[in-house]
């Protein structure tokens, strides 16, 4: 008995000691540090086993549990990668060798078999490779290799992929066909998830991109490439990409193959056969969007980065959209949010039966919060701090639910599976990082804290006082963390923390030496792993690998029922139609869960169905609990409006919902008649409770963004041409003004009433706020730098507490985008960064500013090159200055009410504009307008009358230096604001339209009640003018009462620039070459606007047609392939449009209710197929908008082949030329024009693809009158009577760069003209050196002799000639009677004095001279007689014509070189009308005298001729 007791005592002691040892020892993982990391691979774990695998060098290593690593395979080549098959992680892995051989194992690494060897062809590099298995068939494998060509080719693609497939698990493998050269192909098994709806597990989907043709083909094969089946859904679509997302196949198509920023459309399919386009509330552009699915796999979540390069921004904002359970109909997450939340991050699916997370910010200046949704995004709530946690450490005023947290879920967490996607699960354990709020307690050493949640993110506790990277294993029962910075925990060495009790306590393992972790790898990616591999880099750049292996932790004990506890999701409330209970391991349990996710699968108890379990059906909008309303447009797009009327179910149960006892849903009748047969035009209407004040598109091709300022001081932004709008949060302050940067199309500035400036550099997607200087806002325009978007000048009022004499403007400059301002210049009211604008500035940093001098009541112009730290005065008294093109024009005050014009092209040299003698200026020039500048010429309108409703002026044009002006036309219409009826159609060089005052004489004398206006057009930059040619019939086919042959009495007249409601509206479009629209009438002069019709030209103004009998507003779309008209000033509910260049027109009803459309707008370049109608209800103070899209009205995109022949796909080369001559400005230019009307153009750069078919010889049409010369009735240029020509060398004084000058001819070449050869009216052939430039002149003309040499040789020649001449005179003329007998000498006279042989020789010379002189005079008399006879005969030949005759010289009689006539003694142009061109052909200048009396006798009336 005593022995037995001793035995028991001994046993109990040993057991107690063992227990004490077991309790005292904490379980620790195996942590190995590998310092020889050359070609050391990451750890992988075979699922459901404790077997680990990796590679090093040429070996593959395996480890079982706590055993050591052992070699299972050694190759002749080094191993590049080893990866476990994600679909069959229990047994299969693949290994790639350095020689591109592929091996596989099917038994957890015990044995290995060769699959294939990938070889690159000559001239190719193998970049990467991958192997894919099929989740539903173990034997199916696909190997993909990515190649790049060493030498790029214009025909072959730079990179491409090849695919091989195996049907027997890799025993044999064959290529999946080969794409054509130049084609890039991507292929996937369509089965990407088990239980997929794809009919066959062998189905492969491929997309082939042809980069040269900008096309892609999508097809499927069910027999491994033996046959291909094209997808019919995309026959007329431009496919851009294909992707697989859970149960869905996603295909994106683009509206424009030539525009990388074009609108994208997404199509979804579950079976790879039937695809349906998603219904999306806005536009998707680019391909930078995130797509995830919810836990059921039915809902798709799109998170689209907002704005330019947002996908790479650190704190990018996102627009989030969630689909219904069909994956087709999307709604914006923002629609389900509290209005407090303005800015959103991407949505993440937390895989907890519908749990989603999203970061939000209440405003751009407030702290972020993270929101949770448990119902697929229909409602959201913030994350908050757990009870009992120190809220003050986070900056919260209260704890618990009052402390909302901005939790950024750890990147390691989301990528590893702590939260994860697919099969990943962690029993509700999440880790993240929190940014401390403003005013948090304690040291600010660390701005971030690491937090942990154990209830799927509802409540959070602090885990670390600094940010850590975190990782999870065994479904959250193993947690690892390492500090972002090794020294954050007070220890400079790196360490790894791990927790085995779900983050309640942490153990630390030090890593000797100073290392920083750069990569962490989990052996299994679904959250079940028990092995991890850390890569760390030391200070000396040496690397180590730290393996943390938990496979034998807790002695390998697996959890039993006693180690588990129940957790009810959402506190036991219904979620997705059921109540979910999850088995979680107790945090203190010393065990690991089985390596099987089924151990944590929830228990599901269905709930009775409610509205929350239903969603609106396809084509219905709203929420089930508030009612689902039919949207006819969406129903039509979804194909649900084929029959009429029809009954449809407004809502249905969410797919995958677990609820029972379905609701009784009554069908609704839908009348589809309104949309069944209408064209495929989309309309989106909005009603605003305020009126639009200003609106403008951003000048960018990346999207259709615009901003609106409303009357109640709100700023609205739309990125889809008005389809959706959002409001900018100005924190309660009103938006006072919106300004756009004229040089950078993505930038805009919003002035708020609290002196805050909101700036966007990405078209309104993001804004940042800056404080303006503490001065009064004067609403003066910002001045922008043309090259630096961060530099601009703001003008504020100092001493302006009260508006009085002390109040003055001050300029403040910023060079960092407004974040800091520096006071630059007091008194400045206007500045320009001229150094950034000029082509050749004297200093690129030059700024010019206008300074207001209140005391002397004048303004001063200053300039500076150091931001006005120093400056110098340019002019003492100016009216203003303006930079256009490459010129700055300054209006200088010259005494009381007198203005002069000065121009500069470099900011240093200023030249006064010189006007010709025929320019009759008013006694005091009070104003002028700078109209245009191009190709080195500037147009001015010099005002001659500022009398109200009687304003007009003279149109003048400068030479290439902007100095010497010539008159183009007098009596050009203007208004009191300085606007002028002057327009140059975009894209048409030299074409100008103006309105002239027909009754100018009566207006000048004060006898006219109103101005009578006529529209004139010039095709050669203002040299010649014609009245517009009227159409023969009106829009109803009736002839006009007047005939266009007499254009003085019958021409087309258009309302011009002075009457525009919006000055941005123009006749033309820069993208629709040759197209113009205008409102006017056919008759003697212009009628009032309401009595006019709408006219169209497609040939640059040569011919016109009436398209509507009433005034309409218009816009061009898609480079002119769409023309949209809307009635102006009357109620309407329809638009009229044409898609065939105006040949036919269709009406489209955009609304049921009639409204007055105030404006129709589109993007600045008229390249979009979307338009916005704006209506203002002035009495009710509302605005309505109608976003109209023609994006789907065409069947296809036009084919365009750059560099093709005359017929280029759907385009044809056509020329826009002078109506009377083939050449325009010395060349024949042909543009590509669409000739097939069933396609749209898009962003194909065909407008740039023009060609010059011929350079023409110079003709009279390529010249205009030079300075001081005037145009006469016969078209020649002459000096006015009494005007002396300036010295020819004066041109050298005006242009100091000139080396030579020529004798003036009265003509100068039009700067736009590119002609070569032919006439040279602008100069003689003999240049002369400019004073002081003789050296440069003779270097330029080496054949010329220098001045001293010329003098010497002339003196020598003179001496040689004078001696014999004196002898001849003395002995042959003087003593024979002198010159008095010269005309009497008879050739047979014998009374000449001859004393010797010398006398006889001299007399013979005298006789020969007499013959020569007599012959010369006789020839001249004969020539004069014959020329006079020819002129008389020419006048007789034209006398039968009606009207005055021409005065013309027939040049081929006596001109060997036409230029010889240009050097006349009277310095005029010698009455020239015709000269020889290169081909020796004659041409007539069709110049006719202006005026009603003369014009009544002519078919064509040329304007601009003034009879002498």
Swiss-Prot record:
InterPro entries listed in its UniProt record: Sortilin_C, Sortilin_N, VPS10, VPS10-sortilin, WD40/YVTN_repeat-like_dom_sf
Protein's UniProt keywords contain Ion transport: no
The keyword Membrane appears for this protein: yes
Glycosites: 353, 789, 911, 1243, 1346
Protein's job: Functions as a sorting receptor in the Golgi compartment required for the intracellular sorting and delivery of soluble vacuolar proteins, like carboxypeptidase Y (CPY) and proteinase A. Executes multiple rounds of sorting by cycling between the late Golgi and a prevacuolar endosome-like compartment.
BNR repeat intervals: 164-172, 372-381, 452-461, 497-507, 717-726, 812-822, 1095-1105, 1137-1146
Location relative to the cell: Golgi apparatus, trans-Golgi network membrane; Prevacuolar compartment membrane
Residues annotated as transmembrane: 1349-1369, 1405-1425
Annotated SMART domains: VPS10
Lineage: Eukaryota, Fungi, Dikarya, Ascomycota, Saccharomycotina
Main location: Golgi
GO CC annotations on file: cytosol; Golgi apparatus; membrane
Topological domain spans for side Lumenal: 21-1348, 1426-1508
Membrane topology reported for the UniProt record: Multi-pass membrane protein
Span of the signal peptide: 1-20
Sorted UniProt keywords: Glycoprotein, Golgi apparatus, Membrane, Protein transport, Receptor, Repeat, Signal, Transmembrane, Transmembrane helix, Transport
Pfam families to which the protein is assigned, alphabetical: Sortilin-Vps10 (PF15902), Sortilin_C (PF15901)
BP GO terms, sorted: Golgi to endosome transport; Golgi to vacuole transport; protein targeting to vacuole
Official protein name in the record: Vacuolar protein sorting/targeting protein 10
């Amino acid at each position: 008995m005593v022995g037995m007791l001793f035995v028991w005592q001994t046993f109990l002691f040993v057991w107690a000691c063992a227990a004490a040892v077991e309790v005292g020892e904490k379980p620790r993982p195996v942590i190995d540090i590998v310092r020889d990391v050359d070609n050391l691979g990451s750890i992988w774990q075979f699922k459901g086993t404790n077997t680990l695998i990796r590679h090093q060098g040429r070996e593959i290593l395996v480890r079982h549990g706590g055993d050591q690593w052992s070699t299972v395979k050694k190759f002749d080549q080094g191993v590049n990668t080893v990866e476990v098959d994600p679909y069959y992680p229990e047994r299969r892995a693949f290994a790639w060798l350095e020689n591109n051989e592929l091996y596989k194992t099917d038994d957890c690494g015990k044995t290995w078999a060769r699959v294939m060897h990938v070889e690159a062809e000559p001239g190719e590099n193998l970049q990467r490779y991958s192997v894919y298995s099929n989740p539903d068939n173990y034997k199916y494998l696909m190997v993909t290799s990515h190649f790049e060509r060493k030498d790029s080719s214009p025909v072959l693609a730079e990179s491409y992929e090849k695919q091989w497939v195996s049907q027997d698990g890799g025993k044999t493998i064959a290529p999946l066909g080969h794409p054509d050269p130049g084609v890039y192909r991507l292929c996937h098994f369509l089965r990407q998830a088990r239980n997929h709806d794809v009919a066959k597990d062998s189905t492969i989907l491929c997309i082939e991109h042809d980069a040269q043709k900008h096309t892609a083909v999508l097809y499927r094969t069910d027999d491994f490439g033996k046959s291909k089946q094209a997808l019919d859904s995309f026959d007329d679509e431009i496919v851009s990409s294909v992707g697989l997302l859970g149960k869905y196949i996603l295909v994106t198509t683009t509206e424009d193959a030539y525009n990388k920023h074009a609108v994208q459309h997404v199509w979804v399919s579950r079976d790879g056969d039937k695809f349906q386009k998603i219904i999306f509330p806005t536009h998707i552009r680019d391909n930078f969007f995130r797509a995830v699915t919810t836990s059921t796999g039915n809902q798709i979540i799109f998170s689209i980065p907002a704005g330019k390069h947002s996908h790479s921004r650190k704190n990018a904002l996102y627009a989030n959209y969630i689909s219904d359970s069909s994956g087709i109909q999307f709604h914006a997450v923002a629609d389900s949010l509290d209005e407090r939340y303005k800015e959103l991050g991407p949505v993440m699916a937390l895989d907890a039966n519908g749990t989603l997370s999203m970061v939000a910010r209440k405003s751009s200046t407030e702290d972020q919060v993270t929101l949770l949704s448990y119902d697929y995004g229909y409602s959201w709530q913030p994350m908050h701090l757990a009870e009992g946690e120190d809220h003050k450490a986070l900056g919260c005023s209260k704890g618990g639910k009052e402390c909302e947290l901005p939790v950024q879920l750890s990147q390691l967490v989301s990528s590893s599976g702590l939260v994860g996607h697919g099969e990943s699960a962690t029993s509700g354990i999440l880790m993240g990082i929190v940014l401390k709020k403003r005013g948090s307690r304690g040291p600010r050493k660390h701005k971030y804290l690491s937090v942990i949640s154990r209830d799927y993110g509802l409540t959070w506790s602090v885990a670390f006082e600094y940010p850590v990277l975190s990782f999870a294993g065994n479904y959250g029962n193993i947690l690892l963390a390492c500090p972002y910075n090794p020294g954050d925990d007070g220890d400079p060495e790196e360490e790894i923390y791990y927790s085995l009790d779900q983050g309640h306590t942490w153990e630390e393992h030090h890593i000797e030496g100073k290392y920083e972790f750069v990569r962490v790898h989990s052996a299994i990616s679904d959250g079940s792993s028990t092995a991890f591999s850390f890569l760390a880099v030391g200070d000396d750049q040496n690397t180590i690998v730290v393996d943390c292996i938990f496979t034998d932790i807790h002695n390998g004990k697996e959890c039993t029922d006693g180690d588990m506890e129940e957790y009810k999701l959402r506190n036991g409330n219904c979620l997705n139609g059921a109540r979910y209970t999850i088995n979680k391991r107790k945090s203190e349990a010393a065990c690991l869960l089985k390596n099987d996710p089924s151990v944590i699968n929830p228990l599901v108890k269905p709930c009775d169905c409610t509205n929350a379990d239903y969603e609106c059906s396809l084509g219905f909008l709203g929420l089930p609990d508030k009612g689902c309303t039919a949207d006819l447009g969406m129903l039509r797009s979804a194909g649900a409006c084929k029959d009429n009327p029809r009954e449809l179910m407004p809502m249905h149960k969410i797919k995958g919902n677990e609820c029972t006892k379905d609701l009784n849903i009554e069908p609704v009748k839908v009348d589809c008649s309104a949309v069944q047969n209408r064209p495929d035009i989309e309309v989106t209407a909005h009603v605003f409770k305020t009126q639009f004040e200003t609106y403008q598109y951003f000048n960018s091709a990346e999207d259709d963004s615009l901003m609106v300022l409303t009357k109640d001081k709100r700023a609205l932004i739309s990125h889809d041409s008005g389809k959706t709008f959002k409001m900018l949060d100005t924190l309660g302050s009103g938006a006072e003004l919106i300004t756009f940067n004229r040089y950078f199309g993505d930038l805009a500035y919003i002035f708020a009433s609290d002196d805050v400036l909101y700036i966007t550099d990405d078209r309104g997607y993001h804004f940042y706020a800056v404080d303006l200087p503490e001065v009064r806002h004067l609403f003066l325009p910002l001045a922008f730098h043309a090259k630096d978007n961060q530099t601009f000048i703001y003008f504020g009022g100092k001493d302006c507490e009260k508006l009085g004499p002390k109040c003055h403007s001050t300029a403040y400059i910023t060079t960092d985008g407004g974040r800091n301002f520096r006071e630059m210049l007091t008194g400045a009211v206007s500045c320009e960064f001229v150094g950034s604008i000029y082509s050749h500035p004297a200093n690129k940093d030059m700024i010019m500013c206008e300074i207001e001098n209140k005391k002397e009541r004048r303004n001063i112009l200053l300039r500076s090159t150091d931001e006005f730290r120093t400056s110098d005065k340019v002019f003492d008294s100016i009216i203003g200055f303006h930079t256009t093109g490459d010129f700055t024009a300054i209006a200088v005050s010259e005494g009381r009410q007198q203005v002069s014009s000065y121009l500069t092209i470099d900011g240093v040299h200023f030249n006064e504009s010189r006007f010709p003698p025929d320019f009759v200026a008013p006694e005091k020039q009070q104003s002028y307008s700078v109209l245009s500048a191009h190709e080195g010429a500037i147009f001015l309108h010099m005002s001659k009358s500022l009398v109200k409703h009687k304003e007009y002026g003279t149109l003048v044009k400068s030479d290439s230096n902007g100095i010497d002006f010539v008159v183009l036309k007098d009596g050009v219409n203007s208004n009191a604001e300085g606007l002028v009826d002057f327009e140059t159609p975009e894209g048409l060089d030299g074409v100008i339209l103006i309105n002239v005052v027909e009754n100018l004489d009566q207006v000048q004398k004060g006898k006219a009640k109103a101005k009578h206006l006529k529209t004139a057009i010039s095709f050669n930059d203002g040299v010649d003018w014609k009245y517009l040619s009227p159409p023969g019939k009106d829009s109803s086919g009736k002839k006009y009462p007047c005939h266009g042959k007499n254009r003085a009495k019958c021409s087309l007249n258009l309302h011009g620039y002075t009457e525009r409601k919006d000055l941005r509206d123009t006749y033309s479009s820069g993208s629709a070459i040759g197209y113009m629209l205008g409102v006017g009438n056919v008759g003697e002069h212009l009628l009032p606007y309401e009595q006019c019709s709408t006219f169209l030209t497609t040939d640059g103004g040569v011919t016109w047609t009436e398209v509507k009998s009433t005034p309409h507003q218009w816009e061009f779309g898609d480079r002119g392939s769409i023309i949209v008209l809307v009635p102006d000033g009357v109620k309407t509910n329809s638009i009229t449009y044409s898609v065939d260049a105006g040949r036919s027109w269709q009406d489209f009803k955009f609304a049921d209710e009639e409204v007055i459309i105030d404006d129709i707008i589109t993007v600045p370049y008229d390249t979009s197929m979307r338009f916005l109608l704006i209506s203002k209800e002035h009495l009710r103070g509302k605005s309505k908008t109608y976003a109209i899209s023609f994006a789907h009205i065409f069947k296809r995109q036009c084919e365009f082949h750059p560099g093709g022949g005359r017929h280029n796909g759907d385009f044809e080369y056509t020329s826009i030329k002078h109506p009377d001559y083939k050449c325009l400005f010395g060349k024949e230019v042909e543009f590509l024009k669409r000739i097939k009307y069933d396609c749209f153009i898009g962003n194909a750069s065909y407008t740039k693809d023009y060609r010059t078919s011929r350079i023409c010889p110079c003709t009279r049409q390529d010249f205009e009158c030079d300075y001081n010369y005037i145009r006469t009735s016969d078209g020649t240029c002459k000096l006015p009577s009494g005007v002396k020509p300036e010295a020819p060398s004066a041109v050298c004084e005006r242009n100091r760069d000139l080396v030579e000058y020529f004798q003036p001819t009265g003509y100068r070449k039009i700067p736009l003209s590119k002609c070569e050869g032919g006439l040279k009216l602008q100069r003689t052939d003999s240049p002369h050196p400019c004073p002081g430039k003789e050296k440069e002149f003779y270097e330029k003309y080496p054949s010329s002799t220098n001045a001293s040499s010329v003098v010497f040789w002339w003196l020598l020649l003179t001496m040689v000639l004078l001696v014999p001449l004196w002898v001849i005179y003395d002995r042959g003329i003087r003593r024979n009677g002198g010159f008095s007998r010269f005309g009497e000498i008879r050739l047979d006279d014998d009374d000449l004095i001859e004393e010797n042989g010398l006398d006889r020789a001299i007399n013979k010379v005298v006789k020969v001279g007499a013959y020569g002189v007599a012959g010369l005079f006789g020839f001249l008399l004969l020539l004069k007689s014959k020329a006079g006879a020819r002129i008389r005969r020419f006048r007789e030949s034209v006398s039968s014509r009606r009207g005055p005759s021409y005065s013309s010289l027939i040049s081929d009689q006596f001109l060997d070189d036409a230029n010889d006539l240009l050097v006349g003694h009277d310095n005029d142009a010698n009455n020239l009308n015709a000269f020889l061109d290169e081909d020796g052909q004659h041409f007539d200048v069709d110049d006719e005298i202006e005026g009603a009396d003369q014009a009544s006798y002519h078919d064509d009336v040329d304007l601009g001729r003034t009879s002498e």
